Every structure is written in C-alpha cells, then in structure tokens.
Amino acid sequence: MSPLKIHGPIRIRSMQTGITKWKEGSFEVVEKENKVSLVVHYNTGGIPRIFQLSHNIKNVVLRPSGAKQSRLMLTLQDNSFLSIDKVPSKDAEEMRLFLDAVHQNRLNAAMKPSQGSGSFGAILGSRTSQKETNRQLSYSDNQVSSKRGSLETKDDTPFRKVLGNPSRGSIKAAAGNGVTPARTIPSLTSTSTPLRSGLLENRTEKRKRMLSSGSELNEDYPKENDSSSNNKAMTDPSRKYLTSSREKQLSLKQSEENRTSGLLPLQSSSFYGSRTAAKDYSPGSTNLDRTNISSQTPSAKRSLGFLPQPAPLSVKKLRCNQDYTGWNKPRVPLSSHQQQQLQGFSNLGNTCYMNAILQSLFSLQSFANDLLKQGIPWKKIPLNALIRRFAHLLVKKDICNSETKKDLLKKVKNAISATAERFSGYMQNDAHEFLSQCLDQLKEDMEKLNKTWKIEPVPGEENSPDISATRVYTCPVITNLEFEVQHSIICKVCGEIIPKREQFNDLSIDLPRRKKPLPPRSIQDSLDLFFRAEELEYSCEKCGGKCALVRHKFNRLPRILILHLKRYSFNVALSLNNKIGQQVIIPRYLTLSSHCTENTKPPFNLGWSAQMAVSRPLKASQMVNSCITSPSTPSKNFTFKSKTSLALSLDSDSEDELKRSVALSHRLCEMSGSEQQQEDLEKDSKSCRIEPDKSELENSGFDGMSEEELLAAVLEISKREASPSLSHEDDDKPTSSPDTGFAEDDIQEMPENPDSVETEKPKTITEPDPASFTEITKDCDENKENKTPEGSQGEVDWLQQYDMEREREEQELQQALAQSLQEQEAWEQKEDDDLKRATELSLQEFNNSFVDSLGSDEDSGNEDVLDMEYTEAEAEELKRNAETGNLPHSYRLISVVSHIGSTSSSGHYISDVYDIKKQAWFTYNDLEVSKIQEASVQSDRDRSGYIFFYMHKEIFDELLETEKNSQALNLEVGKTTRQVS
C-alpha cells in the first residue's frame, strides 16, 4: 500500500459544513503547481474534497486506534479538522512524517521560498528509493561517512538535481552522496544548514535545469526513471505509486512515441476533459480550481507534462489568489451540501424520546421566533432554568460541534430532571410524557420571569408603576400550542347549560375501532371521535335531573395543534400494556370546522405579543395559566431575583437614580414585611425592626441629604434587605447567579453539574453560622448585664470561643466535603450501572420485538370507543379536504414522532419534520439526518405514528410566503453584489 494514499473511515469538521459522519474513504497527497494538496475520496463516490497543505497546516497528531492501527488527525490554519481512523500504523506514521515535513517547510517559507518543493522532492524520492533493489539500499548504507561529509560541505549540486526533477534518478544520485531513507529526511530538512543552502535557487533556473538534464538522465538511469515524463506530473509524489513498474514503462513508451510523432491525443483529451469534469466548490475546499484527479488514467496525467505551460482558462488566474482570505469566507452552500449542514442529537443513553421531541419543537418556526426574538433578558434567568437551556440549544444546534451539542443536551435533560426525577436516569421513557413535562416547565419559567419584572427595576426608565406593570414577555407555549376547550353540560330534563373551560397543550385521542369491511380510519376520525357528544350521570341543581349531555367545542384555537394517538391498551389478564399497531391514515390536512362555533377565537397572529395586551396583562396571564399554578404556591418561588439594584445605583452619579433606588428598597421592604405578617404573626418582630428605620428615612426626606449620606442610606437598607435572606432555605435561592447570557458566554462557562446544587452549597458553609452569631451576641449581652469587666481576660475568652467555633465549622466543612465526594462517586457508579443495565435490557427487548415491529392490524381493543359515522357527502368532503385544506379551520401536517417497536415498554423514537426554510421533509434518527418525501412519511408512519403536529393553514401559508420572499430578496441582493464587483 502506498504511504501517500491511506484508507479508512474519514470525518471532516469545518466552520461551513460542521462535522460530517464517519465515511469510508482515503487520503491522497498530490503535488501540483508546486503546491501540495490533500485529496479526500469517499468509497460511496461523489466529488472529492481537496485541501491545500502548503502553508496551511497547523497541527498533525497521530494516536493509536486498536491493534496495529492508528488515527491521524490534521488541523489546518482555518481550524478545519480532518481525521482518518483505523489506518495501519506503518502507513499512518509515514503519512505523519510527510505532513510534518510540509508543516516545517511552512515555518521557513519566508527565508527559503523554494525550500518547500525541493525538500518534498528529496523526501518523496528517498521514499521511492526504498522500493528499488537491495543493491541501492546497501550502497546507501555503505556511504554513511560520505553522506556526513557531503552535508558538512556547501556543494549543493545533488540537491539541485533533486529540485529540478525529483525523480528516482535524481534520488539515486542523492543516495550516492549519503541521503538516508524517508524516515530520517524530515529531521534533515529542518536541521541541516547545507541542505537549506542547496535549495536556494529561483524557479526559472530550476526549470532550465530540468529541461536541459532530461536527455542525460535518460542515458544514465533505467527506463522507468525516464525524466522525459511530464515534469508537472512527476512532481506529484502520489502518482509514482499508482501503477506498477510494468505499467509505468508501457505508459512512458507510449508517451515517447507521441512526443516523437508530434501528436498529443491523450494530452488533449485528458486536459480538456478535465476542464469539463465536476469540480469541488465546497466551502471547505481551498483549491477551487483542482479537478478530479483520480478520474484520469496514469497515461493521461503524465501526458500533461509535454505541454510547456498548460494554461486552462482559470488556473493561472486563480493561482495568484489561492492565499487570498476571501476564499475562506462563508458562502451560500449548494443543494448537494444541505444534508451535511443538518445534524441530529447524540443519544446520551436511551434518550431517543428526548431527541425526537426536541427536533419537532425546534422545527416550529413561530415557536422558535417567539422564544428568541422578543428580547428576553437571559442574564436574569438562572443557568439551570429549562427555558435558558432550551433556548441555548436551539441557537447552537446547527453551528456548534458534536461535543458541545452533547453537553447542551445534557444540560437540557438535567434541567428537566431537576423537576421530574423520572427523567434523571437512563431508562426508557414515554415521548408524550416528556413533551408534557417540557411544555409545562417552559410555561412556569416564563411566568416566573414575568413576575420578576414586576418588582425588578428597569434601568434607564422612569420609576413608574405603569411601566413595570406592563412589561410582559410572551410565552411561546401559550401563543403557539395552548388552546381552550369549552365543555357544555346540558341537563336532559330542563335544558340547563353549565359551561366549563379547560386549557390544553395537546389532545390525547383514541384509536377508532376499525370495521373489517371498511378502509382504515384516519387521524381526522380519531379527532372527531374525541369531540363527539356523550352522556353522563349528572345531578342538576335546578331540576334535580340525573342525566346530562356533554358537548365539547373549541373556544380558542392554537397555531399548532398537537395530537397524541393512544397506541396502547392494557391487558387485564396479563397486567401488561400492549402497543396497538393498527393502521391509521395520516392526512396532510385536517379540519376543526365541525368542532368550532361562531364565537371560537382564531389563533394568535404572528405579530401578536403579550406586550400588545397591556390593558389587562395580569388578568390575561392569570387566566391562561390558571390550570398550571396552584394558588397556594408561595410567590417567592416564582422570583428569579438578581440583586443588582445596588450595583446599578452605585454605578451612576445621578442623585435622581439614588433616590429611585432608595424608594425601590422601601417598597421591597414593605412587600416583604406584609408577606411575613400575613404568613406568621409570631415574626412581627422582624418587620417591626424595619418599620422604625423606614419611618425615620421617610420623615427625614432626601432633599436635604448629601450624596455621601444617600449612599450610606442605600447601603444600610441593602444590608437590612439581605439579613432576612440568611434564614431562608437553600431551595428558595436560585441554583446559580444569572450573570451571563446564553448566546455569547454560556458556551465558555466552566464545567458544571447542573442537575444538582451540591457543588454550590459548601460555599455557604464557610460563612459563620447564624446560630454562632446568636450565641456570641447572647454572651456579650450577658456580660453587659452582669457588668463583666472589659479587660484583656474578657477579650481572650471571646476570641477563644470564636476560634473554637471556627475550628468546629472547619471540621464540619471537611466532613461534609468528604461525604459529598463519596456520595458523588457512588451516584456516578450507580448511574453507570443503570445505563449499562438499561442499554442491555433495551437491546434485548428491542431485538425480541423487532420481528413484530409492524404491529397487529386488529381493533384497538377499546370496546367503549365506537367508530365515527359520516354521511356520504361528509365523507367525500373530508377526503377532499385532506389533500387541499379548503375547509375552514384547516391544519397542515408539519411533524410526526413515531415509535418503532411492538411493545409500549421498549422501542425507539424517530421524528419526521417539515423544514419551512428548506421546504422539505427530513427524518431525524438521533444523530442521523436524511431527506424524505411527504408521501413516504404518510405511508411509512401509518402504523408507528405516535404524536402529530399540525399547523394552522393560514399561519403555515404566511410563514412559507415570508420565507420565499426572503430567499428571493437574498438572491436579488447576491446578483446585484456580483454585478457591482
């Protein structure tokens, strides 16, 4: 195997394309136009990617990878990263030596402009000489002394021949002077001064020497080393290993005949054919004018050398600009690279349920816009809050590397696990349960944020109650996913109607019982089945009737309707949950027209925000969130309070701002005092302790105070504000200080364990215990009451007691830290064991159920669930609407989460989503992303579809039209820019 062409799995990382998947292929080093390049070929075919190596290598690393195998990692100057794995160690080492030589020549390029090509020729030639006869190797070994002597002299004639024509003939001459094999050449090129001096000649002299020495070399050396071959082709080191000696001799004979006759058929066809071949214009390629070299035959490539100076239309023009930094600027990728830009999420250990749900939520463009584009103050939100972790992952998912993305995924999982412990391990979980938990937690975080802004000051604005009261941020869950259903209970005796309203984030619908003669039922049938009228036992307060009828209608529609299809049934005899594999048709459109009234409110338009509803912000917020928050929940649990008001006031020299800060502190003290009086009457002493101070400040006023007195007052009030917080429990505090924004700084934050706050709690132990302060104060008071002398003995006793307390606290701290470390290690070990056990069980159950993964085609088993019956006209209208969406209140399919497996307790989740920006469907299977047709989604997921996302047709059309206009505008701007340039 040629050391300059190695094979193995390849992965490439660049700023433009991200990180690609491991693909089988090869690295091939070629030299062309005195530039060394790396050509990446994939076994699956396609356009090879070409990376310039000359003056472009940043780092080369070789690591072991299995028995007698290695992984070669190459980093370029633009931070592009290339890896090839499972390469034989010998070949990988030779490739590394060559790349190191290229890298070292880059360092000396300023003083030795021609050193690069010269040393490359010496290296490549010496490598070639290893494949010569043993006579040459023994001859080289016997010339050690002469080699050293030649290196000490300044006679550079042999090396000029190397520069002129780095063929085997020239290397043989160099071997006569003692040049060692390939593995020792890199050190010589970097340390030998005579070698460097021998390389100092300009390109014109080299070309003349190459042309003049051709006939001499033909007479002195074997035919396969004939220097009359293409100079340009023979400077390419990799081509010397493409064919055997026999093939080389045949090709050279043919070239000799062509040159003698004056005809160049191979040259013309290969050269001009290569111009029409596909070129690699990918952003990661630095040589845009390189052709597909591997597609040419050796004879065709060698025949190029007979042209004195080949001049394709763009080679010489682009060659001068190869080092121009503008080539590395991000460009709009072609359609062939769209799939490389899309990256999935790594499976952290049975977390396919989380990956599928997150991909579906992130694909909702209106949901993402409401989360990211309303100016939410992320620095005010704790680091471990789900909404902050969620938004951070949404922003970084398409631009960060896989390791960073995996870390962000862990933080999202930890944020949810902190509230719902069932998601903390690595066991399999239900995707619908995760979706419900995620949406509820996002709602709570937004409510906490809005409550925080009611009491937090707004820097730069006047301190008026109206401004703080009207600052409301839009909850993306409420505006996009939440809807309201009105249940009307109608007494069948007197007709009394009792309305009740309920908010939902999604609907869990039953599978309709399929009748054998009829075709399969659809999602539309299941939805209509949910809203059918039903009878129930109900005691009427007006007439005493015991029977009533319940009707369900939409009171407010969502932008996106989420439908959860109940694909499970409970087997009473076996006490097992079974998955139902019944076929259910997935329509492109479904309609809610039969479940709406004339009073039904349409979805929020895309321009709506909570700030527009400032006339009644509190009522609206309480109404839509009434189903989530219990009234008994203390308000202090909803405040993400960042105590920065003091810092804000001290940073300004304005007296008005100081007054405003003091007034704010007063209001906070009053609020905290009133809460304490209402909760516990026995704590009146604390509030009374604050009241005299407030009255004194109020009576004294601020007009007559100097700036220093105002600062002192602010500091005093701030200290009193902070004193009650010492008695609060740790869970009332935010898990971490929200002092960084997710978009810029979170990616650089120190490693942390967001799922617990144990790492932060020891910090509070170092502070003096409040109990110790109480005891010390009590002793001091007793000394005062008993009139203890204030001599040195009292001071010594006090200091001894304080030292004893501090020593005891330090011991407790050390014990707590040791215990915490032990518990952490035990928890990590248990977590690893759980992961291994869960993975084994998951694989075992999945393999057992894979044969039956298509499920059964029987009835749903829900005997009380009847099939919907339509008239012939209604059925025809619904069938037509499923393709066109012409009926009012129609919704368009945009995502499907599917469960693969025959049982409800094990399996695998995948997600199909419609990308509005690319106007195409994609399948996300953990880390793998593939393009799929909508018809395939509808047909392939009819037995496994579990959760369905439908977007209101008008909202969908508006988003699609906006995206098309944006793309058209970008194209027009691009054309104008190119015309101007």
From Swiss-Prot:
Q: Which residues carry this modification: Phosphoserine?
A: S114, S170, S212, S630, S652, S654, S772
Q: What is its EC number?
A: 3.4.19.12
Annotated region Disordered: where? Answer: 111-306, 670-705, 721-797
What UniProt keywords are attached to this protein's entry? Cell cycle, Cell division, Chromosome, Hydrolase, Mitosis, Nucleus, Phosphoprotein, Protease, Repeat, Thiol protease, Ubl conjugation, Ubl conjugation pathway
Motif D-box 2: which ranges? 96-105
Please provide an example of a Pfam family that matches this protein in its UniProt record. UCH_N
User: Where does motif KEN box 2 map?
Assistant: 223-225
* Chain span(s) of sequence motif KEN box 3: 784-786
Q: Which residues form the USP domain?
A: 343-953
Output one GO BP term: regulation of protein stability
Instruction: Mark out the compositionally biased spans (Low complexity).
Output: 183-200
Q: Motif KEN box 1: residue span? A: 32-34
Active-site positions, per UniProt? C352 (nucleophile), H908 (proton acceptor)
Compositional bias (Polar residues): 135-148, 283-300
Q: Where in the cell is it found?
A: Nucleus; Chromosome
Q: A Gene Ontology CC term for this entry?
A: nucleus
Is Cell division found in the keyword set?
A: yes
Recorded hits in SUPFAM superfamilies, A to Z, give:
Cysteine proteinases (SSF54001)
Biased composition range(s): Basic and acidic residues: 149-159, 245-259, 683-697, 721-734, 776-788
How is this protein organized at the quaternary level? Interacts with FZR1/CDH1. Interacts with CDT1.
- Family membership: Belongs to the peptidase C19 family.
Q: What is this protein called?
A: Ubiquitin carboxyl-terminal hydrolase 37
